[in-house]
Amino acid sequence: MNENLDLGNLSTIPIAPEGFKSGFVGIIGRPNVGKSTLMNQLIGQKIAITSPVSQTTRNRLQGILTTDKAQIIFVDTPGIHKPHHTLGKIIVKNAKTAINSVDIILLVVDSSVKSGGGDRYIIDLLKTVNQPVILGLNKSDQQTEKYQEIDESYANLIQDHNWPMIKFSALTGDGVETLQNTLIEQLEPGPYYYPPDLITDQPERFIMAELIREQILQLTRQEVPHSVAVTIEKVEESPKITKIFAAINVERSSQKGIIIGQKGNMLKAIGTTAREQIQKLIAGEVFLKLFVKVEPQWRQSNLRLAEFGYRVEE
């Protein structure tokens, strides 16, 4: 398996040379503005799942970028929105906690559309922070001939703040290097927090479960995705193949039927694509067995939320 995804032996952390910079950057914004896509682009490997469905990210996920001059720990936070259930409240609380625990805040917005109330709400939250803030205008590849009008709408939002504004496309990578260099300029001198070859603080099992959930988000109907939690029940490793047994937990029997599909075709499609993604992750052959379980109202149960890995960050 790819050891770069585990914390490994922290004794491998080197002493930082003179002038080396490091720090934590919180990536925040409304749901579905491309925060996770940006994280993957910055790190150079897929560690955060993406989908057209809003509120895809549920847990805080740290991605680690190490260069010769700096180490940046990116904290990909869930989209800040008005919550409608216990899980939603935990998600938003964790995102707000992240704002207060990082060295730099990267506020990502969707520059293919004008600024809106959700952006103003987040900027109001940031009025009292002491950390530097950078406004990132994502989706520059989707801008139309009205881009100047759109850019101006965001510039007006931050006219009372001395925040740099950088345009980029997390999807194509255009402008991301400029963003990275700006972040490094804002960092203070500091140590290595993690070994240089580490790219995330999350264990492989977490990433595996997320890759399975991503395919559910991509392939099932709108009413199913937010009711799904994936848990890795067992992993059996051998020199030739890694066997993974995972449970897909839903709230209603009707959702179980949708996940399984006619003659099991949907579950097969989810498993096939997820297996391909996991094979890329661990650089080896994978056997993936999926089960579907009904856990009524798990999003409202603190016990079930804890069992499925969702907790309030302190």
Swiss-Prot record:
Residues 21-189 form the Era-type G domain. It holds the Pfam family KH_2. Its main location: cytoplasm. It is found in: Cytoplasm; Cell inner membrane. PROSITE patterns: G_ERA, KH_TYPE_2. An essential GTPase that binds both GDP and GTP, with rapid nucleotide exchange. Plays a role in 16S rRNA processing and 30S ribosomal subunit biogenesis and possibly also in cell cycle regulation and energy metabolism. This is GTPase Era. It comes from Crocosphaera subtropica (strain ATCC 51142 / BH68). The lineage of its organism: Bacteria, Bacillati, Cyanobacteriota, Cyanophyceae, Oscillatoriophycideae.
